[in-house]
């Protein structure tokens, strides 16, 4: 019996296949993609289904079976064409014209209950014309890591893709950076768009200004609809993209997230975070923390992320000059640092409990916070969680009580940075009445969940899968993340 026969659902219409798919990108024509065929897998086991996002598709999780997920996203029944998107990109600063969807494709596009258009994009679904000698597959660990990254960032308020499902495929893969053979998976990502900065860069490489304008009109029509009827819609689009990207990277920085591979082909034209490879959350505040072992010179280290995103936006100006005036784009990009700074300060203040402070207070508090974190090497996430865990309205009245009872307090008088921070935090609290201080306590709890996705945490969920095929620690971790536990 074949796998298709095993998962025969003739008497049960598959709600994932009968969704009202829209041929939005397909309608642009084959200058932007290649039609491909999905790989066939020896064994399909559903390992993850994201019921939390099914209602956004108008689906009741109770009516969607595990077999529905496998049939739609493991056997890929009922959907054609499957589109491998074409793009180029700057990788570690060097232009690479040999890129494109090498192990995935656009499965389809669906209008959500919120009226927004969403992509279903696969990862690990087999070879395409852009596989560049690779097998087109995704390791199981790679799938696990992307599920965790997307859910963690979403709960932290970062604008991110989500994983709709992850299916183990029964293949053994050989990888230089994992014990091999290693298990394999296919994953389906749901986000606004898989159109990348590199999509436009490829069209410029082939001197197709007509296709650049056509694609830009498509992007504005579907993802910047409010600009459609503006006379200067193209310049306004770029200015808004700058703002979205600046705020996104500020969200990463506040979350302590290091993307690791900020090539232009990994930058979404909607300003979303997606495509998670060797990412990491910083264990301590080390500005030069680098997540990818192959980033030898620290190009994509934690502190460089804003400047790299700004550089990527500058590189995007080159193809967009076919449509948008250079001066207009430069004016838009000039506001990047302002947007990034404002978003980062707002988010960091919230992590410290405050909705708003005077500019001098905010600057001094953030400066002292980062100075203490960097010089003490206290855990970045631990510091903020300990603030939330031990906070008391009594801190308002007595500076000696600030962070008392936490696991991070240095011996009295041994850390001037910590002492100065406590005095300032107490002083700021004195500007608030008791009811306002209670709101500060609520903010601390909300913005600093207990669970942090550090690498040891991921390994603790992964090792039982490797050793015993025990998925419960993984499910428990996802549940803890989603519940902000």
From Swiss-Prot:
The active site is at residue 265. The keyword Manganese applies. This is Protein nucleotidyltransferase YdiU. It holds the Pfam family SelO. The lineage of its organism: Bacteria, Bacillati, Cyanobacteriota, Cyanophyceae, Nostocales. Its EC number is 2.7.7.-, 2.7.7.108. Nucleotidyltransferase involved in the post-translational modification of proteins. It can catalyze the addition of adenosine monophosphate (AMP) or uridine monophosphate (UMP) to a protein, resulting in modifications known as AMPylation and UMPylation. It comes from Trichormus variabilis (strain ATCC 29413 / PCC 7937). Its cofactor is Mg(2+); Mn(2+). Keywords: ATP-binding, Magnesium, Manganese, Metal-binding, Nucleotide-binding, Nucleotidyltransferase, Transferase. ATP binds at residues 100, 102-103, 123, 135-136, 189, 196, 275. GO terms for molecular function: AMPylase activity; ATP binding; magnesium ion binding. Mg(2+) binds at residues 266, 275. The gene is ydiU. Belongs to the SELO family. Signal peptide: none annotated. It catalyses: L-seryl-[protein] + ATP = 3-O-(5'-adenylyl)-L-seryl-[protein] + diphosphate; L-threonyl-[protein] + ATP = 3-O-(5'-adenylyl)-L-threonyl-[protein] + diphosphate; L-tyrosyl-[protein] + ATP = O-(5'-adenylyl)-L-tyrosyl-[protein] + diphosphate; L-histidyl-[protein] + UTP = N(tele)-(5'-uridylyl)-L-histidyl-[protein] + diphosphate.
